[in-house]
Curated annotation (Swiss-Prot):
It is found in: Secreted; Host nucleus. Residues 320-335 have a biased composition (Basic and acidic residues). Glycans are attached at residue 609. Residues 1-20 form the signal peptide. This is Secreted RxLR effector protein 138. The keyword Chloroplast does not apply. The gene is RXLR138. It comes from Plasmopara viticola.
């Protein structure tokens, strides 16, 4: 285009020189250079003095318009001037043109006219990068849509304490709406200002899903969501996105609408949620857990803060989703009088409490199956196999005995919440059933802290925690039992959680029995078989593959395995053997007891003072005995029966080092002495010359009032 203008200028200069020659025919001829300069000056005089400036429209930089009247130095690209010539000059210039010049001028004029006729077209986004700008891709359908405020450029300077937005702020505000393809919706119903989480209302599919629930006229299939017409979606596009006019937004909305029509409410799966951990359904063999509704506030109060933090809210939300339930609002599900609410949370116990409420049962829709005698016998057989690796107290069996005497045929629910499984848990010690002729022991709930105070440590160590956990599980009770017959309001709900007891409680609540006469004939046989099972259980309970310490046959071999003593306190005699044997028979000991340990403890108990378990001299004696064990192999053999109980199981077990074994022996001696001093003051007929029983503020063990113990034992009255 510029070449065409240069050709026109050359022609105009030539025409001007020809005109000047005609006007000065009477004057003498001069040098060619002088004639050229004179002609150029004359042409310059004929030109107007207006200076042309580029148009302000940057996209039409080939157009020019007149500017100011002043002559100012211009850039080389702006030296071109648009002038008007007389008709005589134009005709003269046309006469001097050659064929090539005419063709060039025609081509240039055609190009110029074509450029002028073309309208400015909208730039279509391409997948390639444009000049200095990154192309914005359409948003993915599975990513939440983000709304941008219309006055974003005005809000940014307010946050930066400025009155007007700067160029950087305007560019940033312009880039954000282009990235998200739309500005904030104007309609108030699209975004609820009172909603605590506005992201839900900003999602296109979620908005449409919320509207679907408001439809009152459903199709024949009530489980499928009602289809949305494209006309409604078209109106939704116009109302929700007034600024979304490009093709990318239209395509995104169409794809979203197609996906929305294919949604079905009855086929949505919880495990296919993007970005969330898949949770398994709760196991029916495990006890259901109820979660409090105000869990975030409860966590905040425990942390002494006014409001729950984001971490507390996330943790509370995860726990609720994990257990699939919140705390039941109905008070009838939980008994306020029961101190242990676990029995009411058991599925079978809840079913037993609902049996009395089922008065009107539709036989055609739902009917609980009657339990035949054969099924009851099979249940007893399974209990016989699985119950006696665990601890089943004699008080519980006596309660079962009392309940079974009033057995009548009954219904059982087809929904069995707890399945009888074997107790062969990996790397977990099996506890022997308690003997009714031995003392029942209660364990303090703060046993780790008591051990830490007695062993002079700031906090319980791992060995102390392991020992306390095992002892608590070994005796399986932390509080007194109010009576030998455990009822529904007992402190310990273990009996109600037993399968046989649950079945026995349900038998008394049965009201709808069809074959009453037939079952009554077989009732006596069922009860007789039940008593036979109890006798077999009593005989086999103490012969199971469970470690139980007995009186040694070879005292010398037992003494050789025990700890090494440096003084005569560990020397055994007939009195020590008698006390040691009685101590083994009086309790279900949690740890192995050696004769020399009994001899040392007997010396401590017979002191006139400083015999309390909390006394510093007692602690020093046991610590010195543990420090004297210098051989690792001997110490490991000494603690072999109790090694896993003290050091832990599996991957959580502590390494077998001399330091850990010494601490384990020290912890074991402190625990066993607390039990031994109780035994000595209970058996005053066997242990002579005892001082008054100490009354320390903290005890690890306590004898239950339900204990029978040795029938010939004598109980010493408590001392002040």
């Amino acid at each position: 285009m510029r070449s065409a203008f240069y050709v026109a200028i050359v022609l105009l200069v030539a025409a001007g020189s020809q005109t000047a020659a005609k006007c000065d025919q009477d004057e003498p001829q001069h040098a060619p250079s002088n004639n050229f300069m004179a002609s150029f000056d004359r042409v310059d005089q004929m030109l107007p003095s207006q200076v042309l400036q580029a148009s302000r429209n940057l996209k039409d930089d080939f157009m020019f318009s007149a500017g100011d009247e002043e002559r100012t130095p211009l850039a080389p690209s702006k030296l071109l001037k648009k002038v008007k010539f007389p008709d005589s000059v134009i005709s003269t210039a046309s006469a001097m043109r050659t064929t090539e010049d005419v063709n060039a001028i025609e081509i240039a004029s055609k190009n110029l006219n074509q450029l002028r006729s073309n309208k400015r077209q909208r730039i279509v986004q391409t997948p390639n990068k444009m000049a200095g700008q990154a192309v914005v891709t359409p948003p993915a359908l599975d990513i939440p849509l983000v709304s941008v405020a219309n006055e974003k450029s005005l809000k940014l300077p307010k946050r930066r304490t400025r009155k007007r937005p700067t160029a950087v702020v305007e560019n940033a505000a312009r880039s954000v709406p282009q990235h998200d393809y739309h500005s904030a919706p104007q309609d108030s119903f699209k975004i609820n200002a009172e909603a605590p989480n506005a992201r839900l209302y900003n999602q296109l599919i979620t908005q449409k899903a919320l509207q679907l629930e408001k439809n009152e006229h459903l199709e024949k299939n009530a489980r499928e969501e009602e289809l949305v017409s494209f006309d409604l979606l078209h109106l939704f596009e116009k109302s929700a996105h007034p600024a979304a006019g490009n093709r990318q937004e239209a395509n995104a909305i169409k794809v979203a609408s197609k996906n929305l029509i294919q949604l079905e409410s009855n086929t949505r799966k919880r495990n296919n949620v993007v970005g969330q951990v898949k949770r398994k359904r709760p196991n029916r063999d495990r006890s259901p857990v109820s979660v409090a509704n105000g869990k975030p506030l409860g966590l905040a109060k425990r942390r002494k803060s006014n409001h729950p933090t984001a971490v507390a809210k996330n943790a509370a939300s995860s726990v609720k989703q994990h257990d699939h339930r919140v705390a039941p609002p109905e008070p009838s599900r939980l008994d306020a009088k029961a101190l242990d609410g676990r029995i009411n949370n058991q599925q079978i116990t809840q079913k037993a409490s609902q049996l009395d409420k089922n008065e009107h049962v539709d036989k055609r829709s739902w009917r609980e199956e009657l339990v035949s005698v054969d099924e009851l016998m099979h249940l007893f057989d399974e209990f016989d196999k699985s119950a006696h690796p665990t601890t089943v107290s004699r008080q519980e069996t006596s309660a079962i005995e009392a309940t079974s005497k009033s057995l009548i045929p009954a219904e059982s629910s087809t929904h069995k919440g707890i399945a009888l499984t074997s107790n062969d848990v990996v790397e977990v010690g099996v506890h022997a059933p308690p003997d009714p002729d031995k003392f029942l022991v209660l364990v303090a709930d703060n046993m780790p802290m008591i051990l830490a105070e007695r062993l002079k440590t700031t906090s319980p160590t791992a060995i102390m925690n392991n020992a306390a956990r095992f002892v608590t599980q070994h005796y399986e009770r932390l509080a007194h039992l109010e009576s030998s017959t455990t009822n529904a309001e007992a402190l310990s709900g273990r009996l109600i959680n037993q399968p046989i007891t649950q079945k026995a409680l349900q038998l008394d609540k049965s009201q709808h029995v069809d074959d009453v006469e037939d079952i009554e004939k077989q009732f006596s046989r069922a009860v007789g078989h039940f008593w036979h099972l109890r006798e077999v259980n009593d005989k086999s309970a103490h012969t199971t593959a469970v470690y139980r310490q007995t009186v040694p046959d070879d005292w010398n071999a037992e003494y050789a395995k025990g700890p090494k003593t440096l003084s005569q306190d560990g020397k055994i005699n007939n009195d020590v053997k008698e006390v040691h044997a009685a101590f083994l028979e009086a309790f279900n000991l949690p740890f192995h007891q050696y004769p020399q340990e009994t001899a040392i403890m007997l010396k401590i108990v017979q002191r006139k003072n400083k015999s309390s378990p909390n006394n510093f001299r007692t602690f020093k004696t046991f610590k010195l005995l543990a420090q004297n064990q210098m051989i690792l192999s001997h110490l490991q053999e000494l603690l072999a029966p109790d090694l896993k109980k003290l050091l832990g199981y599996g991957n959580m077990a502590l390494p077998i080092t001399l330091k850990n074994l010494k601490e384990a022996l020290n912890v074991k001696l402190v625990i066993m002495y607390d039990l031994f001093i109780i035994f000595c003051h209970e058996r005053v007929d066997l242990v002579k010359d005892l001082p008054p029983k100490p009354t320390p503020s903290q005890w690890i063990f306590e004898i239950s009032t339900l204990s029978s113990g040795n029938k010939n034992r004598q109980v010493l009255p408590p001392h002040d």
